[in-house]
Amino acid sequence: MAADSQTSRLLTFTLLCLLWPQEAGAFPAMPLSSLFANAVLRAQHLHQLAADTYKEFERAYIPEGQRYSIQNAQTAFCFSETIPAPTGKEEAQQRSDMELLRFSLLLIQSWLGPVQFLSRIFTNSLMFGTSDRVYEKLKDLEEGIQALMQELEDGSPRVGQILKQTYDKFDTNMRSDDALLKNYGLLSCFKKDLHKAETYLRVMKCRRFVESSCAF
């Protein structure tokens, strides 16, 4: 009887060891199509948020008569222009998925520091509640892109060291004209960079999973 009891305990222990996941990868993985769909939705949301934030700032602080001249003067240089990233859909279609993912990751990571100061320039605005969560949304997208990179890892050369700079933080001294112009330029770059990231992700999703929404 004792032998039977010991055998039963050993069998139970063995079954538990077999069923317990040995590593994170033992859990069911999300389908690649779902990973792409989630990343695209996050990028679209962030791009729209960046565009809305830019418009709100412009409406609140930049006189209408000065907007065109300021935009043409390129008051802020976007660091993303220093990397050999595609500038549009057509160029993006000529790059591999891994290249586009790495460029997307670089763009997102370059804003993780600066956006932590974004909510401070909208303390008296309806945009405050939204802008205060931008950092968390960027982190979510960063994790989504990294998950895609792990799925598609192909051993190709990395481009992660190309963009070492990050953007300056947003200036909270809203009584200074220089600060206003700086923030206006940063928001313009933020909008452009998120548009690029969204474009790259949509190009990848469309060429892997042909669908009617590929025309954009």
UniProtKB/Swiss-Prot annotation:
Alphabetical UniProt keywords: Disulfide bond, Hormone, Metal-binding, Phosphoprotein, Secreted, Signal, Zinc
Coiled-coil boundaries: none
Predominant place of localization: secreted
Subcellular location: Secreted
Family the UniProt entry places it in: Belongs to the somatotropin/prolactin family.
Function, in words: Plays an important role in growth control. Its major role in stimulating body growth is to stimulate the liver and other tissues to secrete IGF1. It stimulates both the differentiation and proliferation of myoblasts. It also stimulates amino acid uptake and protein synthesis in muscle and other tissues.
Protein's name in the database: Somatotropin
Originating species: Mesocricetus auratus
Lineage: Eukaryota, Metazoa, Chordata, Craniata, Vertebrata
